[in-house]
C-alpha cells in the first residue's frame, strides 16, 4: 500500500474559524477570583481567599485577592476547577497561572498544573501540563499547554506539588487557545567556516600556552610526543589533513576534578551551527601517586555559567592516547562561552592534544551518504518480458515501461500512546507514514501492574489492535527496566524470593498473553545505566530474563536497549561497554537478537554516529534506532537533525530499522522535537521527514530494449509497473527483497 504523505490534517472539530468565536470561549471561570471562590474547590484540602498574608508581606500581584490551598496533607492536594464541557477536543490550550508557596518552613518547591481526565470507559488519565519552581518570596508564572484527544466524561484542572502543610497560593489562572506562532526562517550562515578550528593554539606549536589559562591553581606546560594524525572521527569529517606537530598541553598539580585548561571562544560561536569537538587525551600519574582506576575526561563548555557537554571518555592512567569526541549547538546568543577540559581525580596529570572545535557541513555529509545508500539499500532489477510482437510495429511503437515504488520495506516506526489513538487525525498520519510502532508506556510493568496483583492490559490491547488492523508491526517495550527510579514501589519492597517470583510471573503473563504478536522485545531496558534487578537477584538474572522470554515466545528478537551509545556524551554507555554487555550476556547463555540504540540525541554529527555503528557491527546483530528524537527551537534545524540521523542509519548496512520516539506535539517527552503541531499541521521538520521518505522510493521510466528487458536499480519494497503496448496497458506489481544478485521478474505480455 502506498504511504500517503499529505501535510494537512484538518477537520470540522479543529476548524475553529468557522465555528467558534474565541473571545467567547471561557475555559476557566472566575480566573482572577473577582467572584470570590465560586467555581473553585479544594482537592482534598481547604481553600481560602486572602487580600494579604504574612502580616501584609504577601499581596496579590494583580487584582485585589488571591486564593490559598491550605491544610494540605499530601503532595497532590491543591486548588482545582472542573472544565468539563467547556473545552474542545483536538484543540491546543495554553495555561498561564501566577503562583507562590507559603508555610511549613518551605522556601522553594515545585508547583505543577495537572489535568485529571475520566474517559467514557472509566479509565483515568493524568496529564502533566507544566511545572515551575515556586518560592515563598515572589510570585512566579507557570505556563504550559495541553490537548485532549478524546471525548472524556469529566476533566479537572488542578495545582499540586509542594510538600504537605505548605500552602499553594494562586493569584490567577487563565486557559486560552494556544495559537501557533509563525516558525522562524531557516538560519542564514554567512561564511560558516565549515571545518575551520575555532580553538586558538590548539597544537601549542611554539611551546607557549597562550591564550589558554587554568581553572584553579593547576599548572600548564607543553609536552612532546602526541599523535601526529587527527583522531579518527575528526578525520572522517574533515578528510585529508596535514600532519600534526606532536605537541600537547600538560596539566599538573590538579587538586580538584574540575581543574584543567580553558579558553574563551565567545566571539567565534555562530548560532544554530552544529560544532564537532575532537581531541586526543591521556592521563599520567601525578606527584601524589593517584589511583590507577579508570577516570572520566570531559570536554565541556561554560555557556553563561551553564555546563554544556562536549564529549566524555573513560581513560586509564598510562601511555595510551584516547580519542574524545562530541558535538554541541547554541541557539540563544550567549554573553560568555568558555571551553575547558576536566574530569580526572585529584593528583592525576591531564594531557590534551589537537583539540578541535569546528562547524560541520552536514549537508555535504548527507550527499555522501546518498551514494552509500545506493549500494546498501538498493538492488538491480531486470524486468524480462515475453510475448512481445515480433513484427515491425515494435520499432514504430516501442513498449513504454513506467515503474513506481509504492512501499519501501525498510522499517520506519514511531512511538504512540493510548490517548493519541483517540484522535483520528493522529491515527491518519500514523498509519499513512509508519510501518512499525512501539508503545510509550502502556506495556511497561509499572503501567500494567501499578499495584500488586491488579493487572491491566486494556490500553496495550487497544493499541495492538489498531496496529494489527493496519498491518503495522510492533516492538515490545519493555519487559523490565533496570533503572531503580522506574520500578514501581511494590516491586522495590519485595524480598529476594518474592522478587524472583514476581519477575518470573511478569515474564509468563506478558509473553504468554502476546505470544507471536510482538516482533521485538526490549528485555531489560538500560542495563548500562541501572542495576536494580541484578543487585537484588544476582548477575545471572539478566541472562535468565532473556532465556525465559525466548522459551515462552521464540518468535520475537530479544533486544538490549540503551541511550547515549551513539553520541560520545556518556562514558557509561560507550560502544565498547555496550559490546562487553552483550558478550557477557551471551557468555551466560542469553539469546541477544538485536542491539537497540535509543537515539535521544542533541546536535548529531554523522561521523560520531557512524563510528559507534561501525564498532557495534562487530557483534553481527541487527542494530535498530529504537527511540529517535531530535530537538531544536528552529523547525528547519530540527528537520536537518532528523535528516542527518535518518540517512546515517539508512546508509549503514548493520542498521535494520528506525523508530521515532513520537511525532505529535504534546505527545512527546522532549520539547521542540515534534514533527506535527498539536492541531494537525505538519511543521517544517515534519515536511523534511516526509521529503526524505519520498526520496526512499524508486521510480524508473523507459522502453523495453532489444533483449526484451527493462533494467533499473531500486530500493527494497513493493512496486507497480505499467507497460504501455500497442494493444493496451498492462499493470503488474512485484516485490523486491534484499539480495546481492540482480532480481529477474518475468512478465508475460502474450495475452494481449
From Swiss-Prot:
Identify the EC number(s): 3.2.1.8
Q: Which UniProt keywords apply?
A: Carbohydrate metabolism, Glycosidase, Hydrolase, Polysaccharide degradation, Repeat, Xylan degradation
Among PROSITE patterns, the record links this protein to:
GH10_1, GH10_2
List residues of the CBM-cenC domain: 26-163, 197-344
Q: Where is this region: Disordered?
A: 1-22
Q: Keyword NAD: yes or no?
A: no
Q: From what superkingdom does this record's organism come? A: Eukaryota
Q: What is this protein called?
A: Endo-1,4-beta-xylanase 3
Instruction: Tell me what organism the protein belongs to.
Output: Arabidopsis thaliana
